[in-house]
């Protein structure tokens, strides 16, 4: 997709600090890192979300995520890592090409994933669980 910056990075027509490549995916350092070594792993095919990827592409993407995590662990020795992605603009996805963040966390600056709420109402949880099971 010509107007997608991540597709241009994958095609080699836009610059990025590429740190890992596979036939299915590639990883590069985030241009606006939240921590030293913050990388993003993308599928080579354009997909705005995980729901758009076929099985083999999903497998290739997450194998690359694991390999990037191993590289980050070996090279930078963080105390931990956050790994995840934003799905859709309402969730904070700014580039509509699926990208998985590998975010090293260091003892002096790690915040982890912040808790979003308190315990849920058991009845409401059961209702949502039933709806998900039926879907």
Which residues fall in each region the model found?
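HIT superfamily nucleotide-processing domains
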Residues: 1-135
């Amino acid at each position: 997709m010509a107007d997608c910056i991540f597709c241009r990075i994958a095609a080699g027509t836009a610059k990025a600090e590429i740190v890992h490549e596979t036939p299915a995916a590639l990883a590069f350092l985030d241009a606006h890192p939240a921590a030293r070594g913050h990388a993003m792993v993308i599928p080579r095919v354009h997909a705005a979300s995980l729901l758009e990827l076929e099985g083999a592409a999903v497998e290739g993407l997450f194998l690359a995520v694991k390999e990037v995590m191993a590289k980050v662990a070996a090279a930078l020795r963080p105390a931990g890592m956050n790994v995840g992605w934003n799905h859709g603009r309402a969730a904070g996805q700014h580039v509509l090409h699926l990208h998985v963040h590998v975010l090293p966390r260091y003892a002096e600056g790690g915040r982890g994933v912040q808790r979003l709420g308190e315990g849920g109402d058991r009845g409401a949880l059961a209702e949502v669980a039933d709806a998900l099971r039926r879907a």
